[in-house]
Amino acid sequence: MKELCIYSSFTLLEFSMNKKKVITFLSLIVVTLCAIAGCISPSIELANTPSVTNVKQESVQLIVSAAADLNYVFPEIAKLWEQETKHQVTFNFGSTGQLAQQIDRGAPVDLFAAANKKFVEELDKKGLIFSDTKALYGVGRITLWQKEGSTLEIKDIKDLIKPEIKRVAIANPDHAPYGVATREAMQSVGIWEALQSKLVFGENIKQTQQYAETGNVDLAIVALSLSVNKSGKWTLIPSELHKPLEQMLAIPKSSPHPDVAKKLAAFINGEKGRLLMRKYGFILAGEKPTS
């Protein structure tokens, strides 16, 4: 029995040692093959590195409510931003007052670009926007605009009282900042009351221009940003005739994507955005009107 036990113990020990040798040998083969194939270092990196799925940020669709005077410039800015970020932007253009009402009612807007900072400030007082996102992005100007081919000789806002001018379109001053500026300019030169029978109101500054484009009115007072880089004739109205159209943007608290919206806002006020804003006639921070 004793010999049997000793034999059995040695047999088990020998088997165990042989098994360890086999495992060790096989392990060496695997390690050697991995080293040859160059898979050791990458395997370590993959173990410690988050997957591509976790790192890559999903593209989102931003909803931007913007004043109608931005109808041309903002899509150009958004196109550049989309190319750089792969995010998408959908615009809701309209009069600032009406857009502010939509946000007041809880519309899921990612970025609000107003034609007058007053509307942003009012939303801020109601606690409806992130206060730290408020930023001026430009100062607007107004022009006397006629469609291409018009034979009217208009060199000054006072010329609007001429009898040959029958109808003049302006943005509704009840909710459109550019309409307010137009009324102020007319009041400054003393023609507001005299023009009442001639005035046709557009819901926003873009619709106001369309009235003149289609010939429904003789001319329109519109944003400079809708006059430049476009066919038609226009005359700049002196900025001292009305209060500055200080335009402000902010991110509403109803925004589904506030972090991404902040990046778009920064892009608008960044180098590329400012270049395009200047192209469309906006006065930027630190600049003064030419006339």
Residue ranges of model-derived segments:
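Positively charged n-region of N-terminal signal peptides that target proteins for export
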Residues: 2-3, 17-21
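Exported/periplasmic ABC-transporter solute-binding proteins
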Residues: 35, 39-84, 97, 101-105, ...
